[in-house]
Amino acid sequence: MCAERLGQFMTLALVLATFDPARGTDATNPPEGPQDRSSQQKGRLSLQNTAEIQHCLVNAGDVGCGVFECFENNSCEIRGLHGICMTFLHNAGKFDAQGKSFIKDALKCKAHALRHRFGCISRKCPAIREMVSQLQRECYLKHDLCAAAQENTRVIVEMIHFKDLLLHEPYVDLVNLLLTCGEEVKEAITHSVQVQCEQNWGSLCSILSFCTSAIQKPPTAPPERQPQVDRTKLSRAHHGEAGHHLPEPSSRETGRGAKGERGSKSHPNAHARGRVGGLGAQGPSGSSEWEDEQSEYSDIRR
């Protein structure tokens, strides 16, 4: 139940958070014709939008965040690349030497990949989003994001804002990678996001946190069922041992037992005859059969 509510709530939050920016984009940049309108309905960049991005990428410089700014206004609503770049540059002075080197190399790697890959993929929005997510991951891992985060955890935490996680997918990709950079980084980011969530949404975040912990808690077997399982195993083991040590009686012995029972009802010495018959069964087969016939004859005569 908590899982369903959590999923519904997060979906609603994302829809409400992105509704106003999307509406503002449509109002300020309306489609210029039927072709653009149909392109947006199919979930792909319009031809005009594609040409504008390509022209922007060619003219953008190699230094700064110009390449990422080319993707801020697009019909696929892929935003956040420029914001991440600006956040890294504004906080670069707080990083140590390793962190500054990471910022420089990672931003350059992302800009180079965007410039070369954009013209080689389709105009469909899912393909473009996948391309952006993949190149971000490649550049962050290539230049060791985790090493920079572990040495500059406090600065990394200050850069992450709760509202950005609701509005921009590139921020979500970045945080998901940071959560794999060790327990110290993970706990610091989780605590920061939780506090910001409570500041924005109040006690609702505590409910979501409780649901998440309940979902992640592994199920435990009911204690009352364990003795039943043990008793079943012991019973099966007992029957198995009994079956192993006690062989099943043969048909001949079964027949003699039945005859002995009939004899016990008619004569008090039937048990003695049963013992004699049992001793005779251990001898040769001819002697055993002869004694059986004599026993039957005496029973009939009586």
From Swiss-Prot:
Give the highest taxon in the source lineage. Answer: Eukaryota
Q: Does the keyword Metal-binding apply?
A: no
Modified-residue entries (Phosphothreonine), positions:
254
Q: Name one GO biological process term.
A: intracellular calcium ion homeostasis
Summarize the subunit comment.
Answer: Homodimer; disulfide-linked.
Similarity remark: Belongs to the stanniocalcin family.
In Swiss-Prot or TrEMBL terms, this protein is called Stanniocalcin-2
What is this protein for, i.e. what is its function?
Answer: Has an anti-hypocalcemic action on calcium and phosphate homeostasis.
Chain intervals with Basic and acidic residues compositional bias: 227-264
Instruction: Cite the GO molecular-function annotations of the record.
Output: enzyme binding; heme binding; hormone activity; protein homodimerization activity
A Pfam family name for this chain?
A: Stanniocalcin
Q: Which residues are glycosylated?
A: 73
Task: Give me the Gene Ontology terms describing cellular component.
Answer: endoplasmic reticulum; endoplasmic reticulum lumen; extracellular space; Golgi apparatus; perinuclear region of cytoplasm
The alphabetical list of record keywords is: Disulfide bond, Glycoprotein, Hormone, Phosphoprotein, Secreted, Signal
Task: Map out region (Disordered) in residue numbers.
Answer: 23-44, 217-302
Signal peptide per UniProt: 1-24
Q: Tell me the residues on which Phosphoserine occurs.
A: 250-251
- Expression tissues: Expressed in a variety of tissues including muscle, heart, pancreas, kidney, spleen, prostate, small intestine, colon and peripheral blood leukocytes.
Q: What is its main location?
A: secreted
Q: Which InterPro entries match?
A: Stanniocalcin
The protein's location, in the record's own words, is: Secreted
Query: Is the keyword NAD assigned to this protein?
Result: no
